[in-house]
Amino acid sequence: MNSKNDLNDKFISFLDQTKNEEHKEVTRLNDRVLIIDGLNTFIRGFAVNPAMNDDGLHIGGLIGFLRSVRYTCDILKPSRCIIVFDGKGGSPKRRKIYPEYKANRKVKSKLNRNVDWGTAPQDEQESMKQQMGRLIDYLEQLPLTLISIDNVEADDVMAYISQQVLTESDIFLMSTDKDFLQLVDDRVKVWSPTKKKLYTKDAIQ
């Protein structure tokens, strides 16, 4: 699995490409961009998906994530998919990349598990760590962009990309975090994977 520095370098490369490349192929690639809140999607799958492997180990986070992304891509048919994960140290060291978005944010509530797998908290944390590691390995084999920046949370990066980088693209933000609704405009829409609903500018007015 690549290190955080590798993912940071990939993000810098991504910014350089989207800002400097003007080829028609790149333009088409950025026509309809799906940007996914990675940890939000993983935690949701981990909490509610009871899938087990042949050894009886819980793999709901991994399976739930992949199924959710596949379903969303089938529905929205993006030309490009970007998955953003919280960077190491993101929570205690919040960086205000897009101040207008951060100004009116509410504190996020902790996700409650809907199913008890009968595991101790430390075992649950280890399971999450192992599933996340395997998930990243799988995602790196797919034609999508993975982004994680140390000391920066995923929602900051998603807001920055949608408002400051891909300014000519139709953007679909995938998350259950209602704070993203602040970003909805003529270009930016929010897809709720739990409600299977697309929030447009007209829908939230």
Question: Where are the model-predicted features located?
Answer:
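Noncatalytic, basic helical substrate-engagement surface that gates or grips nucleic-acid strands
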Residues: 2-20, 24-174, 180-198
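A short, charged helix-loop
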Residues: 197-205
